[in-house]
């Protein structure tokens, strides 16, 4: 139960989770907030002892968290063609943002079909979803910046929010800057 934190959190913010046996907190992006139920949905990949410890928690277990942290996304009012661009574990913090937008496009990039997450959640939330995988095992083969270039060239992109690996973010920011499209990266 996250109580007021679920009401205060904004799309793109994150939490610090204190993991047993570790001095360090794990930063985990907020995927979905459920204000009425006072809950936050966190999506993460097990990569070390902290996230391994988290993966053994069960429903009803208590976690110590510090939240909400970070600025979050603040899309401009009235965007007609908003686009969210996510890569890998940068996809979860964009879900809540996409759900808050009118007719968003979600360009989601993954290593493979096996690594793909939340695509149906984005669709249920009202987004037009295009998946790109490095190996072509799901959706289109290539980089997630390719369909973004196409949308910009077609005039179907007037705001971009992106989250993912640094090289992807640098490419997205450069495309946005070149086309004078408002862009936020995280």
Model-derived features with residue positions:
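Ferredoxin-reductase
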Residues: 1-59, 111
């Amino acid at each position: 139960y996250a109580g007021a934190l679920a009401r205060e959190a904004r799309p793109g913010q994150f939490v610090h989770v204190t993991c047993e046996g570790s001095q360090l907190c794990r930063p985990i992006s907020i995927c979905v907030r459920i204000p009425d139920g006072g809950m936050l949905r966190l999506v993460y990949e097990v990569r070390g002892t902290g996230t391994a410890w988290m993966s053994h928690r069960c429903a009803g277990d208590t976690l110590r968290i510090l939240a909400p942290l970070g600025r979050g996304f603040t899309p401009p009012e009235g965007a007609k063609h908003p686009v969210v661009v996510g890569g890998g574990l940068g996809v979860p913090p964009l879900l809540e943002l996409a759900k808050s937008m009118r007719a968003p496009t979600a360009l989601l990039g993954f290593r493979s079909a096996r690594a793909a997450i939340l695509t149906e959640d984005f669709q249920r939330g009202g987004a037009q979803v295009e998946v790109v995988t490095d190996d072509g095992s799901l959706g289109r083969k290539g980089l997630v910046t390719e369909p973004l270039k196409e949308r910009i060239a077609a005039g179907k992109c007037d705001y971009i929010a992106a989250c993912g690996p640094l090289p992807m973010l640098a490419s997205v920011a450069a495309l946005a800057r070149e086309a004078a499209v408002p862009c936020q990266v995280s």
